[in-house]
């Protein structure tokens, strides 16, 4: 694989490789960017977000996406869906630029997830139970600037949630929630069709386009 570089988002530097909690594998940095909102004519940056994926992702994505440019990938809803739902592990690090309580963060995530699931008719008791667990994990968590919320997503359907105050990664997660829809929804909310970080999407497209197009012999599914 081509050399993977670090990415700096505001004052936070995301390293090229990490070993996330809840996995025994090393992941490479797929892309990173800010999440912000336009408030009274000014762009306010709330979090810096990095998306890491395991090495197997490149050969998996190359089957369908080899030969595409970074711009073509950025404009493709299906490309990001294939990252979210692909048969490989993903790790997302959400680092605070401005302080945000765990309750504020988790309630917004759950609100968006439930609205989407209801709109497509996939909201069941299992999802209701999973979102309640999700809210509980974040209940008394404070996230000052520099603190991170960490998500390790298994293709088997588990979501490992962890926290870090100083940028270091703990060995073990705080909670594991087994629900495939919730597991995928967290990353979907960041890089999906209405993802909250267009900058992270562009970064992913540019870096993965290079890796995919350099990849030899894409495997057939």
Curated annotation (Swiss-Prot):
Pfam families (alphabetical): Chalcone
Enzyme Commission code: 5.5.1.6
Please describe what this protein does: Catalyzes the intramolecular cyclization of bicyclic chalcones into tricyclic (S)-flavanones. Responsible for the isomerization of 4,2',4',6'-tetrahydroxychalcone (also termed chalcone) into naringenin.
Which InterPro entries does its entry note?
CFI (IPR044164), Chalcone_isomerase (IPR016087), Chalcone_isomerase_3-sand (IPR016088), Chalcone_isomerase_bundle_sf (IPR016089), Chalcone_isomerase_sf (IPR036298)
What is the originating organism of this protein?
Answer: Dianthus caryophyllus
UniProt KW keywords: Flavonoid biosynthesis, Isomerase
The pathway entry for this protein reads as: Secondary metabolite biosynthesis; flavonoid biosynthesis
The residues annotated as site (Important for catalytic activity) are: 105
* Additional notes on this entry: Part of the biosynthetic pathway for all classes of flavonoids, a large class of secondary plant metabolites, many of which are brightly colored.
Any one GO molecular-function label of the UniProt entry: chalcone isomerase activity
User: What top-level class of enzyme does the UniProt entry assign?
Assistant: isomerase
**Catalysed reaction per UniProt?**
a chalcone = a flavanone
- Cysteines joined through disulfide linkages: none
Family as reported in the entry's similarity comment: Belongs to the chalcone isomerase family.
- Residues binding substrate are 47, 112, 189
Sequence intervals crossing the membrane: none
What is this protein's record name? Chalcone--flavanone isomerase
């Amino acid at each position: 694989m081509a050399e993977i570089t670090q990415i700096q988002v505001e004052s936070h530097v995301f390293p090229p490789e990490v070993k996330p909690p809840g996995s025994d594998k090393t992941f490479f940095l797929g892309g990173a960017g800010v999440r912000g909102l336009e408030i009274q004519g000014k762009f306010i940056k709330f979090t810096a977000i990095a998306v890491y994926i395991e090495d197997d992702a490149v050969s998996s994505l190359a089957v369908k996406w080899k030969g595409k440019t970074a711009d073509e990938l950025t404009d493709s809803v299906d490309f990001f869906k294939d990252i979210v739902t692909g048969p490989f592990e993903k790790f997302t690090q959400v680092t605070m630029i401005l302080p945000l309580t765990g309750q504020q963060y988790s309630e917004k995530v759950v609100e968006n997830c439930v609205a989407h699931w209801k709109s497509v008719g996939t909201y069941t008791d299992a999802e209701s139970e999973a979102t309640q667990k999700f809210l509980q994990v974040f209940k008394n968590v404070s996230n000052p600037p520099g603190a991170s919320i960490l998500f390790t997503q298994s293709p088997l359907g588990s979501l490992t949630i962890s926290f870090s105050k100083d940028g270091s990664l703990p060995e073990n997660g705080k909670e594991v929630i087994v629900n495939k829809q919730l597991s995928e929804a967290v990353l979907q909310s960041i890089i999906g069709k209405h993802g909250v970080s267009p900058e992270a999407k562009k970064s992913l497209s540019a870096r993965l386009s290079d890796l995919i197009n350099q990849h030899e012999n894409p495997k057939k599914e």
